[in-house]
Amino acid sequence: MALRHSVIHINNRGGSVGYRSDVAFACTEEVHEIVIAAAEMNKEFKEFLMADDLWRGVNDEIPSNVLKSGTEGRYFWQSIKYYDGFPACEALNGIMGFLDDLGRDAEYGFIKLGEEMDDNELLGEPGAFDLYINRSIEV
């Protein structure tokens, strides 16, 4: 029987703050217009998009286009709680599901990289948007 290790973050009061993931989403200009329209109708979704690490300048090599009309969408969040049932997550999941139902899954890419080594979720066509998983150890 193999032992599995889980990572659970503990806050400064001793309570668990939950399972965290890195999440990337990219899409065509046309799909980005749908994302922007959805954000205008859903406050939690808009706040989620505005919390994108590219917009906050975490990686200055990649210009942010958060909620900018006329551009492809490219979003990245580090160490976030991405759970089913959270309104913002459900909004993005709903958009991706809608695109899948229309057979337009090639117009977006999504990667969720969890804390567990085997917790990887890829939807749409991430490679078409230069989204890839790269786990490494730096010494």
Say what each PLM segment does:
Residues 38, 42-43, 48-139:
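Charged interaction segments
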Residues 2-40:
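Short, extreme N-terminal segment that most often corresponds to the first beta-strand
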